């Protein structure tokens, strides 16, 4: 899915006090750019919605998302699809993914995700994790009273792009867009 997920549920009528967990929790994504000038005035280490860069400069990007309650899933697919303006050149080697809580930060190993450049549909790149649930369950093994794992961890994907010479062809333009879409498992009964 790419937005919300919903499931039908069967209610246990033999036990009128049974708890029913509605699985409509889904991840969201926020995109930020790290402004290199004026970090002190911007705050948040310069992470902002816009940035001012010169041709040839490295432009740091960050996608922030979250792990929803995925206890009903055996596996959980997670992928970011990005469409960059042609004035930006993507650096696939710069991709880093962190899963974190207030107490712990885990950086995914390069073999735990895949970077696909020019995957089709006009996209510049796609970064996918085949089973982020297995990683979170292994690295953040926190159980609740029902012996289910506790989710809600932040997922942060960082990468760099370079403002290339194509930016000079359109200097009066207000900005160079970079759009992201998050794809994730939306059916707990299907791997």
Task: Locate each region found by the language model.
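Serine/threonine-rich, low-complexity linker/repeat segments that form flexible spacers/stalks
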Residues: 8-72, 81, 177-182, 186-191
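Short structured motifs
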Residues: 42-49, 65-67, 126-145
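Short, acidic/polar linear motifs in exposed loop/turn regions
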Residues: 69-71, 84, 165-167
């Amino acid at each position: 899915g790419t937005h919300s997920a919903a499931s039908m549920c069967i209610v246990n009528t033999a036990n009128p006090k049974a708890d029913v967990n509605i699985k409509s929790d889904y991840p969201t994504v926020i995109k930020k750019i790290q402004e290199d000038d004026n970090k002190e005035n911007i705050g948040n280490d310069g992470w902002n919605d816009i940035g001012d860069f010169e041709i040839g400069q490295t432009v740091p990007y960050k996608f922030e998302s979250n792990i929803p309650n995925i206890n009903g899933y055996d596996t959980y697919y997670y992928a970011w699809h990005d469409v960059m303006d042609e004035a930006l050149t993507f650096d696939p080697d710069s991709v880093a993914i962190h899963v974190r809580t207030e107490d712990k930060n885990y950086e995914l190993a390069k073999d735990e995700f895949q970077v696909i450049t020019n995957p089709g549909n006009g996209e510049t790149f796609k970064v996918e994790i085949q089973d982020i649930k297995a990683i979170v369950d292994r690295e953040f093994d926190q159980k609740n009273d029902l012996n289910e794992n506790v989710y809600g961890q932040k997922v942060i994907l960082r990468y760099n792009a370079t403002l290339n010479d194509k930016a000079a062809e359109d200097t009066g333009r207000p900005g160079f867009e970079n759009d992201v879409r998050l794809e994730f498992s939306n059916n707990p009964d299907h791997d």
